[in-house]
A protein has these predicted regions:
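SAM cofactor-binding core of SAM-dependent methyltransferases
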Residues: 94-165
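SAM-dependent nucleic-acid methyltransferase catalytic core
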Residues: 59-86, 93, 138-246, 250-257, ...
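Short linker/helix segments within small regulatory modules
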Residues: 12-22
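Short cysteine-rich clusters marking metal-coordination/redox-active sites
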Residues: 1-4, 25-28
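Residues immediately within or flanking Cys/His clusters that coordinate Zn2+
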Residues: 1, 22, 49
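Short metal-binding segments enriched for Cys and/or His
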Residues: 27-46
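Long, positively charged, glycine-interspersed low-complexity recognition regions
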Residues: 265-326
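Cys/His-rich microdomains that often coordinate metals
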Residues: 5-8, 32
Length: 326
């Protein structure tokens, strides 16, 4: 085994993959390819490093891109709108369907759709508020905008929105969507489970939000919104070579503080295990790009054959870097 070094006396001691190109180790459950085997696997993992902690691993090339980063109405923690120029070289020039199993603000998918580089996009999120928002943008556009038209961006409106998000069960879709939008716009960094932003009085901009929502709604025939477990979505859409899976799960180190639907250690391991199983056992299907925070855990989870890791810089609040605007 190339991972743990275990030696086996015969093939009866190992589990060969269905294509006969390698085997699964019974000791560490990792995959080892046979010598001389080349696989058609299109899997890249982007590990985000802090702007003040990139050192020699950081690759800061500036890339010209046709992808716009300010299309989503949402402010989203970990959103990829500011990183599109860095991620763009790893995206397909054109794809039939782009799928985001952890949609969030959906900045990457919207950029690909509006640039004409994706024919359709699939936005999935398990967070009830996020799902309600995107389904309302497409199906109940004017109802959603009417629900927030008279919002002034006050602390009381923010707290009421948070109360709705804390108890989403049984809420009408548009009510939940409006609450999510209000909390997202007024919260610190768009974190709806956090406190209100210090400059909340200036955060609410109905015209900008309405313009972006209506622009997205114009593409409703090319956007599918789902509310499923992300692993099920990955399994469903992996098998088509004309699909692009952009997998942007909750951060490992701060996920619980940032998201209402976060991942525990076992969840991160299951996700990495599924991606490993699909790409190694059934290569040549969908293109996959995974984004994560750079840390020892993610380095370990994605330490398997044929994965192309690259490091990108994200600006965080710190003493030596300046954040860009939302």
């Amino acid at each position: 085994c190339r991972v743990c070094g275990a030696i086996f006396a015969s093939q009866d001691d190992i589990e060969e993959d269905v294509h006969g190109t390698g085997f699964w180790c019974p000791e560490c459950e990792r995959f080892t390819p046979y010598a001389g085997i080349t696989r058609i696997i299109d899997l890249s993992v982007c590990l985000e490093t802090k702007a003040c902690d990139c050192r020699e691993r950081q690759m800061d090339e500036q890339v010209k891109s046709d992808l716009q980063g300010r299309l989503s109405p949402l402010r989203y923690p970990g959103g990829k709108g500011k990183m599109l120029k860095q991620l763009e070289p790893h995206f397909p020039e054109h794809i039939g369907t782009m799928v985001e199993p952890f949609a969030g603000g959906a900045a990457a998918s919207l950029a690909m759709l509006f640039a004409g580089r994706a024919d359709r996009i699939v936005l999935n999120d398990l967070d009830p508020g996020v799902y309600a928002f995107w389904i309302s943008v497409l199906k109940y556009t004017e109802e959603l905008l009417n629900a927030v038209h008279n919002i002034q961006g006050t602390r009381e409106e923010f707290l009421q929105a948070k109360r709705i998000l804390d108890r989403p069960d049984g809420r009408p879709t548009v009510e939940l969507a409006a609450a999510f939008l209000i909390a997202n716009q007024l919260a610190f960094s768009g974190i709806t489970k956090a406190g209100i932003a210090g400059d909340y009085e200036r955060r609410w901009n109905y015209k900008k939000v309405a313009d972006r929502i209506r622009r997205i709604a114009a593409y409703k025939d090319r956007i599918t919104v789902m509310h499923m477990d992300a692993l099920q979505v990955i399994e469903e859409f992996y098998w088509n070579a004309d699909h692009f899976l952009f997998i942007d799960p909750p951060y490992v180190l701060q996920g619980k503080q940032l998201y209402r639907e976060w991942y525990e250690t076992d969840d991160h391991k299951r996700l990495a295990g599924l991606i490993q199983d699909l790409t190694l056992s059934y290569p040549g299907c969908a293109k996959i790009v995974v984004t994560y925070d750079a840390c020892p855990e993610t380095e370990e989870y994605y330490d398997f054959p044929y994965v192309g890791k690259f490091y990108k810089q994200r600006n965080y609040s710190c003493g030596c870097s300046r954040n860009t605007k939302d």
